[in-house]
UniProtKB/Swiss-Prot annotation:
InterPro entries from the UniProt entry: GTP-CH-I_C/QueF (IPR043133), GTP-CH-I_N (IPR043134), GTP_CycHdrlase_I (IPR001474), GTP_CycHdrlase_I_CS (IPR018234), GTP_CycHdrlase_I_dom (IPR020602)
Pfam families per record: GTP_cyclohydroI
Annotated protein name in UniProt: GTP cyclohydrolase 1
Phylogenetic lineage: Bacteria, Bacillati, Bacillota, Bacilli, Bacillales
Superkingdom classification of source: Bacteria
Catalytic reaction annotation: GTP + H2O = 7,8-dihydroneopterin 3'-triphosphate + formate + H(+)
Family: Belongs to the GTP cyclohydrolase I family.
Length: 189
């Protein structure tokens, strides 16, 4: 994938600063356009990655019970306003035939999917779909909780408001007891 054009971003940020009545040449702002460009390169790093590659290596274990990695911190940028949203993801799956992934791989998939202009709903669904396709588990459950700056610093101005999304696949969709177990473990400290 081609690299992010930092100079083009810096030029655009300079135009934005001028459009809001600022002087992009003043001391505090002189380097801001390139700082923003470097920040975008970092926060949009997921655009250059295929998150599914994290599941290219699967381990065959004698484990067919629930696997849950909870409180995976993530951040993303709202594609509607280009302001951050951030929170935690809880990712659970039920291995099939002992097929398990390294635990860090679940967090890496969340990071790669999040680091692009995005919607929380799409992150949640994409993580679940990648896991279903690559791990071939009996089921997947992804729950994400996030605070969106587009609701905190503008518009309705409601700091502290959390948005919760879920994607439920396979056994978790059909088994209330299994789904309840995941929810109880997420709440448990």
């Amino acid at each position: 994938m081609e690299q992010i054009d930092k100079q083009k971003i810096a030029d655009a940020v300079k135009v934005i600063l001028e459009a809001v009545g600022e002087n992009p040449e003043r001391e505090g702002l002189i380097d801001t356009p390139m700082r923003v460009a470097r920040m975008y390169e970092e926060v949009f790093a997921g655009l250059k990655k295929d998150p599914s590659v994290h599941f290219d290596t699967i381990f065959e274990e004698q484990h067919e019970e629930l696997v849950l990695v909870k409180d995976i911190r993530f951040s993303s940028m709202c594609e509607h306003h280009l302001v951050p949203f951030f929170g935690v993801a809880h990712v659970a799956y039920l291995p099939q035939n002992g097929r398990v992934a390294g635990l860090s791989k679940l967090a890496r998939v969340v990071d790669d999917v999040s680091r692009r202009p995005q919607l929380q709903e799409r992150i949640t669904t994409t993580v679940a779909e990648i896991m279903m396709e690559k791990l071939k588990p009996l089921g997947v459950m992804v729950i994400m909780e996030a605070e969106h700056m587009c609701m905190t610093i503008r518009g309705v101005n409601k700091p502290g408001t959390k948005t919760i999304t879920s994607a439920v696949r396979g056994a978790f969709k059909n088994d209330d007891k299994l789904r309840s177990e995941v929810l109880a473990l997420i709440k448990h400290n």
